[in-house]
């Protein structure tokens, strides 16, 4: 697909593992990415920052990194800043885009200011009175609601709340993961979609139909009964418009090259963006490989394409 001589990449580290709540997912993603790059002839090597200092990348002659870390310091700008310091090119967004992309609260603030539609929401702080805030939030946003930590990925600790009585406990649970909790109005009627972004590839939208209440961690990485619809069933002109809006949602956060933008449609077909992912999962259940496969791009070709974006100025 790319026609790139794999020698151009030099010695490549596949960063995976790490210390976040998404470590196990990252280990799976990283192993597959490593194999995909090696299948294409890339000089790729495993590197787990939880086990080795990042300075070893420079000491051992790595010139490029494929970031398969998920959540925590692998996705919040810290690894990106360190790689910048060591002069190592890497996949995905830089410090700013990574930091904003993992912070759902500040993501939504930017979107509100730049005209990207996002569900109405409230924030709750860890030391707030959960019962009092729950009463206020239900009065303002109604039910059902989604409760999520501001800075976790893979739907870690995301809860759907259908009754006012259940909201205080959901707030308390989410607050164990982050000092800021997002409470978001549930958008009903049109389904959940994702737009995968990989440079100039025109990847199809995917409609996600989980067997359970919503697309949670289990549905993403464990369950085999989640449906991924490609084509997504939308008219071509609407799909093209949503892809453009997804790219805007990605770009206004300072995100670059590679990632995902997730959104809901309401019954009237209006889009509401939930979050971006600047280091998407690359497991057997993950969405970018599915989107690529639908247009004839293999897993190995996809990871080479993503890595090739690090060759750009």
From Swiss-Prot:
Binding of ATP, residues: 138-193
Keyword terms, alphabetized: ATP-binding, Cell shape, Cell wall biogenesis/degradation, Cytoplasm, Ligase, Magnesium, Manganese, Metal-binding, Nucleotide-binding, Peptidoglycan synthesis
Catalytic class of the enzyme: ligase
Any GO BP annotation: peptidoglycan biosynthetic process
Transmembrane segments: none
Function: Cell wall formation.
Name recorded for this polypeptide: D-alanine--D-alanine ligase
Subcellular location: Cytoplasm
Gene: ddl
Origin species: Burkholderia multivorans (strain ATCC 17616 / 249)
Domain ATP-grasp: 108-308
Family assignment from sequence similarity: Belongs to the D-alanine--D-alanine ligase family.
EC number: 6.3.2.4
Residues that, per the record, bind Mg(2+) 1: 262, 275
């Amino acid at each position: 697909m790319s026609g790139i001589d794999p020698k151009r990449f030099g010695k490549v580290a596949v960063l995976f593992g790490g210390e976040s709540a998404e470590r196990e997912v990252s280990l799976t993603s990283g192993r597959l990415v490593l194999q995909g790059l090696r299948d294409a002839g890339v000089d790729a090597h495993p590197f787990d920052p939880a086990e080795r200092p990042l300075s070893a990348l420079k000491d051992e002659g790595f010139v490029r990194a494929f970031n398969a870390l998920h959540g925590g310091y692998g996705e919040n700008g810290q690894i990106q800043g360190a790689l910048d310091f060591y002069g190592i090119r890497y996949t995905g967004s830089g410090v700013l885009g990574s930091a904003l992309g993992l912070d759902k609260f500040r993501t939504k603030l930017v979107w509100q200011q730049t005209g990207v539609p996002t569900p109405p929401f409230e924030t709750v702080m860890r030391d707030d009175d959960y019962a009092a805030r729950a009463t206020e939030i239900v009065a303002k946003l109604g039910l059902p609601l989604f409760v999520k930590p501001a800075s976790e990925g893979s739907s870690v600790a995301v809860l759907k709340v259908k009754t006012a009585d259940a909201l205080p406990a959901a707030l308390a649970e989410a607050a164990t993961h982050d000092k800021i909790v997002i409470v978001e109005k549930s958008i009903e009627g049109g389904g959940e979609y994702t737009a995968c972004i990989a440079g100039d590839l025109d990847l199809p939208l995917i409609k996600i139909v989980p067997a359970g209440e919503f697309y949670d961690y289990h549905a993403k990485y464990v369950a085999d009964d989640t449906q991924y619809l490609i084509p997504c069933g939308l008219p071509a002109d609407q799909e093209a418009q949503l892809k453009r809006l997804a790219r805007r949602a990605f770009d206004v956060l300072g995100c670059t090259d590679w990632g995902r933008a997730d959104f809901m449609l309401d019954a009237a077909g209006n889009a509401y963006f939930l979050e971006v992912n600047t280091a998407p999962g690359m497991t057997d259940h993950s969405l970018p490989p599915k989107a690529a496969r639908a247009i004839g791009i293999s897993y190995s070709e996809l990871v080479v394409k993503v890595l090739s974006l690090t060759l750009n100025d």
